[in-house]
């Protein structure tokens, strides 16, 4: 038996909606904030960061999802690439990973082995190692990884901190969620290749910049607009996006034009609706709200220093009010 992929809500399209996540997180805020905590629940960033000593901070994160595809090697590799992205988004280097694998009793052991083998290879390629994990029998299949990284405490990146005048840049095309949902030849294979690629090289490019990025995150289940909204949490800024400049995966625009949507489309739209201004078309919204599994890095950088592995998609401006923080032009 193989794990059946729920394509319309597999991968990061299965991510719980932001209001539910906020509710759950509120109940986890127990006790005092640790003295060495740099980033934690209150910041709601891509990973937690704790200062271990003057020169070292520990980055920890966990991520996983139901299978978006049938091939176990692709599933494991994509899940690992997706999980390490959170470490890279904090400016850290991957160290170790723990794996959690839930599966029905009838699942072929060879299938499970292929998931683990490909995931472990991705972690190793990033300079880390899978050092343990846990397995349980479950009615539904889920694979996730908890990844640790190390970074200097003074060089941690965060999702907030973008400044007016910064350029908004993206390292991967959007639309893989649409391609997985449609499962059409050509676009499907292209999406697999995009999702298997880690953001390690993109993070390295950001590290080589003369001026550190003002803000960095990765595009995941809430789509580009959802993660841009999260970058505005500190207030005072708005994100102006040129929809025509956004890189799109092969075939994704055609899929959007024929009405393909993922299971996360409506919840992602609801999340950003009050913040959104401009006149994006329905097809543009399908791309901009598309949940990404192993999506690219999204960064706010100096406009005169855009790394080669990134595409400029917009500009950070001063906010004119507290609500209209996402401006989309076409």
Kindly label every feature range from the protein language model:
Residues 1-89, 163-168, 310-315:
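N-terminal glycine-rich phosphate/pyrophosphate-binding loops that anchor nucleotide-derived ligands
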Residues 37-39, 47-50, 85-88, 120, ...:
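A generic local secondary-structure boundary/capping motif
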Residues 146-155, 187-209:
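Active-site glycine-rich loop that binds ribose-phosphate moieties when present
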Residues 48-59, 199-203, 269-279:
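Acidic-glycine-rich active-site phosphate/pyrophosphate-binding loop
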């Amino acid at each position: 038996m193989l794990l059946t992929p729920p394509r319309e809500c597999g991968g990061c399209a299965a991510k719980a909606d932001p209001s539910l996540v906020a509710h759950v997180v509120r109940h986890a805020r127990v006790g005092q904030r640790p003295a060495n905590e740099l980033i934690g629940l209150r910041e709601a960033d891509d990973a937690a960061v704790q200062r271990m000593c003057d020169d070292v901070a520990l980055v920890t994160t966990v991520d996983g999802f139901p299978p978006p595809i049938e091939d176990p090697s692709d599933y494991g590799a994509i899940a690992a690439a997706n999980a390490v992205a959170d470490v890279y988004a904090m400016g850290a280097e991957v160290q170790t990973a723990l794996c959690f694998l839930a599966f029905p009793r009838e699942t072929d052991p060879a299938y499970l082995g292929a998931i683990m083998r490909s995931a472990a290879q991705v972690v190793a390629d990033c300079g880390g190692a899978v050092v343990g994990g846990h397995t349980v029998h479950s009615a539904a299949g889920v694979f996730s990884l908890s990844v640790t990284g190390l970074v200097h405490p003074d060089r941690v990146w965060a999702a907030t901190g973008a400044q007016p005048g910064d350029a908004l840049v993206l390292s991967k095309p959007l639309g893989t969620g649409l391609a997985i949902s449609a499962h059409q030849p050509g676009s499907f294979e292209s999406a697999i290749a995009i999702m298997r690629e880690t953001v390690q090289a993109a993070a390295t490019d950001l590290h080589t910049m003369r001026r550190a990025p003002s803000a960095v995150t990765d595009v995941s289940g809430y789509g580009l607009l959802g993660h841009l909204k999260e970058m505005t949490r500190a207030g005072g800024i708005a994100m102006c996006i040129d929809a025509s400049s956004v890189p799109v995966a092969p075939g994704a625009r055609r899929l959007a034009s024929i009405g393909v949507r993922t299971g996360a489309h409506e919840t992602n739209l609801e999340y950003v609706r009050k913040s959104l201004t401009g006149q994006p078309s329905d097809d543009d919204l399908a791309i901009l709200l598309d949940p990404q599994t192993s999506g690219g890095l999204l960064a706010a950088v100096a406009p005169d220093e855009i790394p080669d592995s990134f595409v400029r998609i917009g500009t950070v401006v001063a906010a004119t009010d507290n609500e209209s923080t996402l401006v989309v032009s076409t």
